[in-house]
């Protein structure tokens, strides 16, 4: 079964999907979906790699694992489906976006418009059990998403990596900083946002770098849904 992702990513990831560890992960995941409530739904697991093709990635915003509440996760880091209340981290992201670029806080929490402009919203672990944060940690997803990061690092075209919090910053060693650009700050979670996430202006920093590279900037402001 081919994972539901963009053809350009399929070409990049195909050999990874043939590895024995991935076959084990797949079998384990089948059993998890059969016996547990798991988020996101199977078709959305690779949504980040479906909406943003390999060649078009300009920015990576690295998350940890999906939201574990009903109806929240849909395969994009920090993003929630329309109609779902903004989780605390996303609320803080929107607050910083407003302070940084003056973007009004949207009436929904879907970041699909970012993904469609080349922002890869990647969690390092792609699934989670309902109500159990980090429940799928250490099962093999980290190897999959490390390969995604490595593939982007191999590209000649520069990528901006946005690393919020220690978990994301642990991936720094995989990134060639002579070629790519890293923006880091504390995590937007309520536990750490006041320790340096607020006021860090990541969105304008990303755009300044893209402009310097001669690349089209991201329109970070998100339209309300009627």
From Swiss-Prot:
PROSITE patterns: U_DNA_GLYCOSYLASE (PS00130)
Keyword hit for Lipid metabolism: no
Keyword vocabulary terms for this entry: Cytoplasm, DNA damage, DNA repair, Hydrolase
Catalytic activity of the protein: Hydrolyzes single-stranded DNA or mismatched double-stranded DNA and polynucleotides, releasing free uracil
Cell compartments where the protein resides: Cytoplasm
Highest taxon, organism lineage: Bacteria
GO biological process, one term: base-excision repair, AP site formation via deaminated base removal
E.C. numbers: 3.2.2.27
NCBIfam families: PRK05254.1-1, PRK05254.1-2, PRK05254.1-4, PRK05254.1-5, ung
The protein's name in its UniProt record: Uracil-DNA glycosylase
Taxonomic lineage of the native organism: Bacteria, Bacillati, Bacillota, Bacilli, Bacillales
């Amino acid at each position: 079964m081919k994972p539901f992702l963009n053809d350009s990513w399929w070409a990049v990831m195909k050999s990874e999907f043939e590895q024995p560890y991935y076959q084990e992960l797949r079998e384990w995941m089948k059993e998890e979906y059969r016996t547990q409530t798991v988020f996101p739904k199977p078709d959305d697991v690779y949504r980040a790699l479906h909406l943003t093709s390999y060649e078009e990635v300009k920015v990576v915003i690295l998350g940890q694992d999906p939201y574990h509440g009903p109806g929240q996760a849909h395969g994009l880091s920090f993003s929630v489906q329309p109609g779902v209340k903004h989780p605390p981290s996303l609320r803080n992201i929107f607050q910083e976006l407003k302070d940084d670029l003056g973007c009004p806080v949207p009436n929904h929490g879907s970041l699909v418009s970012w993904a469609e402009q080349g922002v890869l919203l990647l969690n390092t672990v792609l699934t989670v059990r309902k109500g159990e944060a980090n429940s799928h940690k250490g099962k093999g997803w980290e190897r999959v998403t490390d390969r995604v990061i490595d593939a982007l690092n191999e590209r000649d075209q520069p990528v901006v990596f946005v690393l919020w919090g220690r978990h994301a910053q642990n991936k720094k060693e995989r990134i060639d900083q002579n070629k790519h650009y890293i923006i880091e700050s504390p995590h937007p979670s309520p536990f750490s946002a006041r320790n340096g996430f607020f006021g860090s202006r990541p969105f304008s920093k990303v755009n300044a770098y893209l402009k310097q590279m001669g690349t089209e900037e991201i329109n970070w402001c998100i339209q309300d849904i009627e």
